[in-house]
Amino acid sequence: MAAPGEALTPQGYIQHHLTNLHVGEGFWTWHIDSLFFSVGLGVLFLWIFRSVGKKATSGVPGKLQCFIEMIVEFVDNSVKESFHGRNALIAPLALTIFVWVFMMNFMDMLPVDWLPWLASLAGVPYLKVVPTTDVNITFSLAIGVFVLIIYYSIKVKGVSGFVKELTLQPFNHKAMIPVNLLLETVTLVAKPISLALRLFGNLYAGELIFILIALMYGTNLLLSSLGVTLQLGWLIFHILVITLQAFIFMMLTIVYLSMAHEDH
């Protein structure tokens, strides 16, 4: 990092924006900024939806209530179309995942320097404001889904049914049990890994593009003008990206849990 009062090089600027505020080292490193924004946005989500739910009226609803009802109906329809079991938890879980992941993704729409600059005034050297650009956060979400997959697989099918699913598919012969176990284990473990890395990769790349565009403002008038156009264009396109990634994470969660409820 550059010394106080010294301008960052382009490489240093990029590295600075991609570094988390953290404590500890190695495996025991805590990314304070990722935890703060993810938990804070989760609490904000609960507060908004609880407040709207308590004030909901059967009369003419307000704009916020209409918006919330539209989201709830959209998620509920998605669950009905993709989840083929019976579980009252799935719809609330899907709603939580969709809105929470979207809110974390939406932090990427803020100008890359605003919050880090404000934090620097308080003596905070680093601040990453997009939790889903931290692979630890995306893996935490994916592992939570993975635990539910295992739990419902055993609950619905029983321990013996779950073991049979791992050992007697796709080849229903005892001699193929080792091959089946290897294939099914890889398939099972790939679910949380793909969930986590897909979300992380798309948001990390999006954040990096915003950072690269921001570098153009410190060059010359021509590139600065081009930077404004590029930033506006990428901002509009990125609205689709952050929404789509939240939707994909939600839909894959619904599909995986639906598969866990299937009793072969």
Curated annotation (Swiss-Prot):
It comes from Shewanella sp. (strain ANA-3). GO terms for biological process: proton motive force-driven plasma membrane ATP synthesis. It holds the Pfam family ATP-synt_A. F-type ATPases have 2 components, CF(1) - the catalytic core - and CF(0) - the membrane proton channel. CF(1) has five subunits: alpha(3), beta(3), gamma(1), delta(1), epsilon(1). CF(0) has three main subunits: a(1), b(2) and c(9-12). The alpha and beta chains form an alternating ring which encloses part of the gamma chain. CF(1) is attached to CF(0) by a central stalk formed by the gamma and epsilon chains, while a peripheral stalk is formed by the delta and b chains. GO terms for molecular function: proton-transporting ATP synthase activity, rotational mechanism. The keyword Ion transport applies. Keywords: ATP synthesis, Cell inner membrane, Cell membrane, CF(0), Hydrogen ion transport, Ion transport, Membrane, Transmembrane, Transmembrane helix, Transport. HAMAP family: ATP_synth_a_bact. It is found in: Cell inner membrane. The chain crosses the membrane at residues 29-49, 87-107, 134-154, 177-197, 208-228, 235-255. This is ATP synthase subunit a. It is a multi-pass membrane protein. Disulfide bonds: none annotated. The gene is atpB. InterPro entries: ATP_syn_F0_a_bact/chloroplast, ATP_synth_F0_asu, ATP_synth_F0_asu_AS, F0_ATP_A_sf. Belongs to the ATPase A chain family. Key component of the proton channel; it plays a direct role in the translocation of protons across the membrane. GO terms for cellular component: plasma membrane; proton-transporting ATP synthase complex.
